[in-house]
Amino acid sequence: MHAVRYSQAFIPTLKEAPADAQVASHKLLVRAGFIRQLGAGIYDYLPLAKRSLAKVEAIVREEMDAIGGQEFYLPALHPAEIWKESGRWDVMGDNMFRLKDRKGGDYCLGMTHEEIFTAVARDELRSYRQLPQVWYQIQTKFRDEPRPKSGLLRVRQFTMKDAYSFDVDRAGLDRSYEDQRRAYEKIFTRCGLDFVAVQAHSGSMGGSESSEFMVRTEAGEDLVAACPRCRYAANTETATSRVAAEADGPGLGAPEKFATPGVVTIEALEQAPHSVPARRQLKTLVYMADEKPVIAVVRGDQELNEAKLQTATGAVAVRPAHPEEIPPLMGARAGSLGAVRFTRARVLVDPSLADRKDMVTGANEDGFHLRGVDVRRDVLAHGATLAELRTVKAGEGCPRCDGTLDVFKALEIGHIFKLGTKYSESMKATVLDAEGKQVPIVMGSYGIGVERILAAAIELHHDDNGIVFPMAIAPFHATVLTLGPEPELRKAAEEVVAALGKEGVEVLFDDRDERAGVKFKDADLLGIPIRIAVGKKGLAAGNVEWKLRKGGAVELVPVGEVARKAAEAVRAAT
């Protein structure tokens, strides 16, 4: 195997990270010469990055092929018509890059390929006998991120492995989904990632069920609620919990209005002279679900989860109502709102409030609130419905056992969906079933962010000196360096490099005319798993220095044995 000579390689390392780099992976990928920024959310992948990304892709291919996946390569440029068939042309909004050709035709740069693969299935699949099918590709995607940041974690151009399963029924989809789940677990394990699979929100993808694969890291933008006792785990967009029961008094026979001039926040109502604890307040929020008003009610000390509201309403998009939209509907401005006997819009109430009594809420009159509210009597009895709306908090009870939930930041590295017939029905992708009837194909969708795997690995595996790569995705398995300019050291190092190559070990040979300290620092920064140093003292005794990047002590290894030792280390770790 051919070694790469450092003196001839393009590895533009830096002593300092960019001023705008905030997360470890961004800092280290730039400092180690893996990436350079071309524009906001757009990166050049330099040779070291290309080597590591190619290894990630190879692992993904092996595991996809192992479950019967067949690789495609479909266009990144899509005509608008196919996205309009599914209804997602408008749903994607500003997140989609859109363009016109010279004839005025509408196109987009693909964010994902559900529509495109469904079109292939519609045109080519005719019978249940052709199913199941598992198709995938590793291809460039585009997303017009409003705030690209954190290096490779939030970009506008990225590489995704997207796979799609096609089955004749739900049972087949269940099998395909589990095949993908197991394949994902193998992929992430091989890439050296400590991950957790969690229940997730399907969002604009649609479908009946989805799971995200998450890496726990402060660099993540998602929040996961997990129970260490029973292993329940879910994105907070879908997570539920047990809330401790409140000891409510009997309340009043009917709500009673009282003056609250200038009180327009939960916190203000907690203060004297009113002194109403937040947990005894009803927080009433006005949202627009597909531009239709909906009222959401949660406890005063709880936060509304917009993803849950979207699920509860079945809306494509939800947003907070603008201040000027609220008074015509509610009769008051924000801060004095309530849902008591309210029937002018759909009202959703979090289940944790169902049996609460003696609560306080806005009176839908500026400067006034109501006390003595019985949620079931005064809200639910007038057409409101229960729906999971609140965001769970750390310390709340697990919904599956007697444990308590931990909530932590996490980074999504993969997402799998049971799409069902969402796309096949809208795009008329059908096959004949065993009874000769036309039925919509039952689909699944499965995505992995290739660059995110690289970035996540670095977030998990780094120290003060640089990257600490897992062997399977390191740009090289080993680096060989000399500890002096003497010809005999160079000759011995060349022989070690050749022996390593014969064993299949990928080597970066640091043949630069630099001090040993510089070479050691660069080796640590690049994160190459094995460091082999050839020095005068050791060589005189027939040895070389061996050190593992992952916290290993320096060992002396006979020159004739080092290649075998390295090959064994590579095989054990990949």
Swiss-Prot record:
InterPro entries: aa-tRNA-synt_IIb, aa-tRNA-synth_II, aa-tRNA-synth_II/BPL/LPL, Anticodon-bd, Anticodon-bd_dom_sf, Pro-tRNA-ligase_IIa, Pro-tRNA-synth_IIa_bac-type, Pro-tRNA-Synthase_IIa_type1. It comes from the Bacteria. Its main location: cytoplasm. GO terms for molecular function: aminoacyl-tRNA deacylase activity; ATP binding; proline-tRNA ligase activity. GO terms for biological process: prolyl-tRNA aminoacylation. Belongs to the class-II aminoacyl-tRNA synthetase family. ProS type 1 subfamily. This is Proline--tRNA ligase.
